[in-house]
Amino acid sequence: MVDSQPHPDSYYFASANRQTDYPEFSGTESCDVCVIGGGVTGLSSALHLSERGYRVILLEGNQIGWGASGRNGGQRIFGYSCEMSKIRSLVGVDDAKKLWDLSLESLELTRQLIHDHQIQCDWTDGQMHAAIKPRQHRELELWRAELSADYQYDHLELWTGNELKSKINTDRYLAGLYDSNSGHLHPLNYTLGLADAAEKQGVFIYEKTMVREVREGSRIKVITSKGDVSCSYLILAGNAYLSGISGQIHKKLMPVGTYIGATDPLGKEKARELITNNMAVADINFV
């Protein structure tokens, strides 16, 4: 197992609201719930459990937000990575509706957490899926019709021609499906804000604490290099970084890499000239 690592250089790290200085875990502790992973999943779980009276210890192998939570594209978008029709064909109408509702609930929860805990993460409403080819334009039309008819989702607008050009200064896109309910934020600052909220709520947060082994029994024992945590419940929230901790889960993990580039600062005037409403934009080419 690799040793702890600092945050990689990135735009998000360079513009973070603060640097973290949580202690490294050592000794022996006991709690109701131990959370492995200091990203959005782990921190949100820890925060909500602590609010309900559980004693929670969170262990992060590197630093808070080190993984995907702190260096993703920052877009918070409705739905999933494929059309709901594909999900419906796999799980059926009823479960597809539940999954759809869950995706909308996650958007609302993000906004609620930002509001309740005054998280400074540059949340901005608005996101657009862009079509480059005529076939993609038709896909966006069908997508909008499906979500309106089957899920009563009426936040979408389909833009073309001059209307589209007035929103984004490029001739590359043929159409854009705009969602006023989605948005974008600074992912690392959002994650750090969740850590602040969790700590204030009473969660014990430790960084640079690699978990070496998990032993199951009447109580679960989480073994680190400098101590162990005994808990009644364990949450594995390490995403693709759970190698060696749970063989059962590891067999089902497929790490996927995405890549993000940042320009030099454009200045507010130039940025607004390019995207007039400051929405997030993503084309629908398959990656």
Name the predicted role of every residue range.
Residues M1-V33, E51:
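Extreme N-terminal leader/targeting segments of oxidoreductases
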Residues V2-S15, C82-R88, Q112-G126, A131-G193:
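Flavin (FAD/FMN) cofactor-binding and adjacent substrate-gating region
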Residues E29-L58:
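N-terminal Rossmann-like FAD-binding beta1-loop-alpha1 element of flavoenzymes
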Residues N72-D101:
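Glycine-rich active-site loop/strand segments that organize a redox cofactor
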Residues R138, E146, R172-S232:
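Helical element adjacent to the flavin cofactor pocket in flavoenzyme catalytic cores
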